[in-house]
């Protein structure tokens, strides 16, 4: 866990009192343990170096991105996965090397394709037959592409974040021949060069079995097609711990199991080992982030429920409403026994604006207290909205006892900056 209580009973991160952060900078605020982010990246590097295989690790921008996050990614020698013009723009503004950027997405617009080509990104991840034609049409020079294929593997996770099954808006089906058609179209194109294949079977996956099965299916399929590729990218989806009972993906042993299986399979198939790519996002930043809120109204309905309302909600914490995701809350300003079961509710005008049902908190919780919601580093700020004209929160990186603001709190003026009068 990235937080702990100090001798004064205050919750801390990297030795910094989160009560002090909340009082100094306001709430809602998202704080990250910068050293934990870096260590997660380094753990992946070490695990792959031990495998002896050529590899690349790309950070999935969609989990959380901003200029300072991109700079951190560059410092730790990761590549970058983007899925929109905005994510690409952010990366370029941060000074990230374009050749180390990969552009994903099931519906890249003509403008996005041109923008990526103009900036000489590393490669496109092809998601449809039509996209092959579009990129070839707008390219003037050789363009590296990777085909996103669907191996037909269903990861055991929430149906909204499964992506490797046949019925998916993402990728090209192996079973139904779309992947083979894509290879043929790339080979017949004027400007495109096939660099490799990519697959992403889902998110919040705790074990290795689905990744191993996927790798074997794709390697065998490539062998059947008589194709040797430079890169086999297994995507991301490595799970993290949100609540007690969850298990984080075991990076060291997990990568070893996956790479051992790949080495064994390529030996059986008699093919050269491709470079192995992965795209972690959640597992890099998820557990390193915590959201701070101030407690407001407390409403107790006798024998039914007790609602503890906070000054944020689904505008900065949508995953509970979207996926029925589970979280843990801690009282920031006092270390007391969590002897009460409550519902932590957001302040937005939606009955579904619930952060945690059956949250365990001290019965003494009152207006003006601060709460920390753990493991909110991924898909929180990046999925934040201005619903109810709520302002997006500020974001800080904490390191060596100091708080560094990496995203300023959205101002009221910024809420209407694009409105016409």
Curated annotation (Swiss-Prot):
It is an enzyme of class 4 (lyase). The active site is at residue 349. One of its GO terms (molecular function) is diaminopimelate decarboxylase activity. Disruption phenotype: Disruption of this gene does not affect growth in rich organic media but reduces the level of methicillin resistance by nearly 100-fold. SUPFAM superfamilies: Alanine racemase C-terminal domain-like, PLP-binding barrel. GO terms for biological process: lysine biosynthetic process via diaminopimelate; response to antibiotic. It catalyses: meso-2,6-diaminopimelate + H(+) = L-lysine + CO2. Its cofactor is pyridoxal 5'-phosphate. Gene3D superfamilies: Alanine racemase (3.20.20.10), Lyase, Ornithine Decarboxylase, Chain A, domain 1 (2.40.37.10). Pyridoxal 5'-phosphate binds at residues 237, 279-282, 379. The modification N6-(pyridoxal phosphate)lysine is found at residue 62. Its EC number is 4.1.1.20. Pathway: Amino-acid biosynthesis; L-lysine biosynthesis via DAP pathway; L-lysine from DL-2,6-diaminopimelate: step 1/1. Substrate binds at residues 282, 319, 323, 350, 379. Pfam families: Orn_Arg_deC_N, Orn_DAP_Arg_deC. Belongs to the Orn/Lys/Arg decarboxylase class-II family. LysA subfamily. Specifically catalyzes the decarboxylation of meso-diaminopimelate (meso-DAP) to L-lysine. Plays a role in beta-lactam antibiotic resistance. Homodimer. PANTHER family: DIAMINOPIMELATE DECARBOXYLASE (PTHR43727), GROUP IV DECARBOXYLASE (PTHR43727:SF2). This is Diaminopimelate decarboxylase. It comes from Staphylococcus aureus (strain COL).
């Amino acid at each position: 866990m990235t937080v702990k209580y100090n001798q004064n009973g205050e919750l801390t991160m990297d030795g910094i009192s989160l009560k002090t952060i909340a009082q100094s900078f306001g709430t809602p605020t998202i704080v990250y343990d910068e050293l934990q982010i870096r260590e997660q990246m380094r753990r992946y590097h070490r695990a792959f170096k031990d495998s002896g295989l050529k590899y690349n690790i790309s950070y999935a921008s969609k989990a959380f991105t901003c200029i300072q996050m991109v700079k951190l990614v560059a410092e730790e020698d990761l590549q970058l996965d983007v899925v929109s013009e905005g994510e690409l723009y952010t990366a370029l503004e941060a000074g990230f090397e374009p050749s180390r950027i990969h552009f994903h997405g099931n519906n890249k617009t003509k403008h996005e394709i041109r923008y990526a080509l103009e900036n000489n990104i590393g490669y496109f991840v092809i998601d449809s037959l039509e996209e092959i034609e579009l990129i070839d049409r707008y390219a003037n020079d050789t363009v590296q592409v990777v085909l996103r294929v669907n191996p037909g593997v269903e990861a055991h996770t929430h149906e909204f974040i499964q992506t490797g099954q046949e019925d998916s808006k993402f990728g090209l089906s192996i079973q139904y021949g779309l992947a083979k058609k894509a290879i043929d179209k790339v080979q017949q194109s004027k400007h495109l060069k096939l660099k490799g294949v990519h697959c992403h079977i889902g998110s919040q996956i705790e074990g290795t079995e689905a990744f191993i099965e996927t790798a074997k299916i794709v390697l065998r399929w490539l062998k059947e097609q008589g194709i040797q590729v430079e890169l086999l990218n297994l995507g991301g989806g490595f799970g993290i711990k949100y609540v007690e009972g969850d298990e984080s993906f075991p990076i060291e042993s997990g990568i070893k199991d996956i790479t051992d299986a790949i080495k064994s399979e390529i030996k059986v198939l008699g093919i050269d080992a491709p470079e192995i790519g992965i795209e972690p996002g959640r597992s890099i930043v998820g557990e390193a982030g915590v959201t701070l809120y101030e407690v407001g109204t407390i409403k107790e309905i006798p024998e039914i429920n007790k609602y503890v309302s906070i000054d944020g909600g689904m505008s900065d914490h949508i995953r509970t409403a979207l996926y029925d995701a589970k979280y843990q809350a801690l009282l920031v300003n006092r270390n007391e026994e969590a002897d009460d079961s409550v519902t932590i509710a957001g302040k937005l005008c939606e009955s579904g604006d619930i952060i945690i049902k059956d949250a365990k908190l001290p019965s003494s919780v009152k207006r003006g207290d601060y709460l920390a919601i753990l493991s909110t580093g991924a898909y929180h700020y990046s999925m934040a909205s201005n619903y109810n004209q709520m302002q997006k929160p500020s974001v800080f990186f904490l390191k060596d006892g100091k708080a560094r603001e990496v995203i300023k709190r959205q101002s009221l003026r910024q809420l209407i900056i694009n409105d016409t009068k």
